[in-house]
Each structure stands twice: as structure tokens, then as C-alpha cells.
């Protein structure tokens, strides 16, 4: 079967790309053909992307501030975009570039799938995009969603009405967060099959090591005594805590990020590395401090000691969801003067048992979903 997946693969961040790679790998392993639809909105790339971000920031009304923001932000965004475009071409199977709904309507497949990440939430411009609800797909084609996420838990009445209509056209829906299951149930949708794992967790550590990680990158960071910071939100408290934690524990602080401005936040800065080096940094870290959902997923999947700092916005529900699922809610930092979590060792025997059960269930969902088997709600 030919399966084409639309997901948020194009942002310049590691999680978006890694979950896309995992989705293709899993579907191919099930014996099907799979490609990521290379849908890249023009208002999210290059200078237009920076202007879109700027227009959503109400604090930049002053023309000089706007020019300064563009002058600083555009080169950073452009460099990261070039790097990630190169990685996408190297690691990801994609269709030809689609920049509009008209382009998407020309695609053909046996099944279209909405993939993971925050596909059903607002885009950079603040509005949802019906393309991620498969509104371009022909009526006679199967419409599926695996590990889709809303990115938030509250929508206005008009948006809910639109969502209910678009989601009702799907054959089967599986979502990533518990909060999404609650919403679908409240909206009266009957075509959802429950909560599933993020695609990155469908592959275990050894599979990721074989698929992505190069030996020279793994050796490069072996036996290094460091705390790794993977931060995606602008939270000065996180940056300050990580510096104090490293000093308290006597470990080196290493920070990895695709955005150059994080060089100012402390620690040895590794700027926009290849996926192999990124995963090697996680694999070798003694402890990880993160506010990132995928940073959390890979910390758990690689059996690492980690400290979770929830972001100060609605997106934190996805982090909480995977922590609850694996029994690791106690890794959430509640006090920025508390350094005890770095010494509190996680029992990964129990965690891996829970994760393996959920992995098997999720793999069965995606297998049955594509093969058009019957479902029972989980």
C-alpha cells in the first residue's frame, strides 16, 4: 500500500525531523511504501517566515525594533533552514515540494495520513491549516491520523465546529496526548481509537543507534562528564538553573540547539549539529535538562537520567502526558533551588516494561489502521 504522510517535518528543530523519520521507517517495516509530503508553507520559510513570526509578536510595534528583530533573526533562521533542508534530503523520504493546497490536491496515494507533532494546532500565523486535516484528499482514499496533536487544550467555538467537521471525515484517528482523547470524546467523535506513542518511541534505542548514529559521533562524546541542556522555550529560569546545577554537581554544561542566539545562555554551545551528533550527545550525557517534548522522549528511550522543566505555556500538556504514561511525573522540577533530581536514579527496568507494552499496542494500532482492520477503542 502507498501511504503518504503530512506532518510538521519542516520546522528547523530536531524533534520534527526525527518523528518524521520514525514514521516512515515504521510504515515501511510493516511492508508498505511511505513518503512524507514535503508541504512547506511559503509564510513559514525564509524572510516570509520571520515576518510571520514578527506579526504575531505584539511587542514589536516600533519600526526600529522590527528592523532590528529582522536583521538579527533572519540570518539565524536562514542558516538553520539550510542545515535542516540538507538533513531532510539525507535522512527522509519525501514527495516533491508542495507549497499550496492546489499542489497537495495533485498527490495520489492508497491512504493519506496526518502524522505526529502539533499538526492540529495553530500555525506560525496563529490559524489552523486545513491541509493537516487532509482536506485536499480525494473522498475515495483512506484518511488516517497517527499520534496527531492539537498542541493546546482549548479552542473557541468556531474552531471546534470546524475541527469536528474535518475530523469526522477521517476513517480512523489515533492521538498522542491524553488531553486530545478527552477533547475528541467531548466533541462526540467516534472514529478515534485512543492514545498512542509518539513515532520516535516506536523505535527502541538500538534501532535508533543503527538507523542514525555514526560510530565516530558516538565515540566523540563517550566518557565525557557533562549535563546536556536541550531547551526550546525562552525561559531564563531554565538557563540559570542548568548553570547552577552543573556547578553544584561538578559536571560540564553542554547546550545543543539549532538557533544561534542560545549561545548566550551558558555552557559549551553546540550549534545545529547533524542528527547523528545530536542523538550521540543524548546517548552519552550523564543527565539531561530539557523543556522539549522530544528531548523528554529520547531521554526516556535512551534510559537517561533527566530533569523535566515544563514550559510556561499550554504545550506542556504533551510533556506531562508521556511522563504520566511512563510513570515519570516525579522528574518534573518544582523548585528551581532543588538539585536532588540529578542524584535520584530512575528505575528503567519498570519504565521499559511500561514503554514496551505501549510500544506493542501502538504498533498494532498503526498496522491495523493501514490494513483496514476493525478497531476497539482503547
Label every PLM stretch briefly:
Residues 193-201, 205, 258-259, 263-291:
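Donor nucleotide-activated moiety binding/catalytic core segment of transferases
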Residues 94-106, 120-126, 147-225, 231-232:
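A nucleotide-sugar donor-handling region in carbohydrate enzymes
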Residues 3-14, 18-165, 213-214:
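Aromatic- and Gly/Pro-rich donor/ligand-binding loops
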Residues 325-378:
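Leloir-type glycosyltransferase catalytic cores
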Residues 145-151, 183, 232-233, 237-274, ...:
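Catalytic donor nucleotide-activated moiety binding site of glycosyltransferases and closely related
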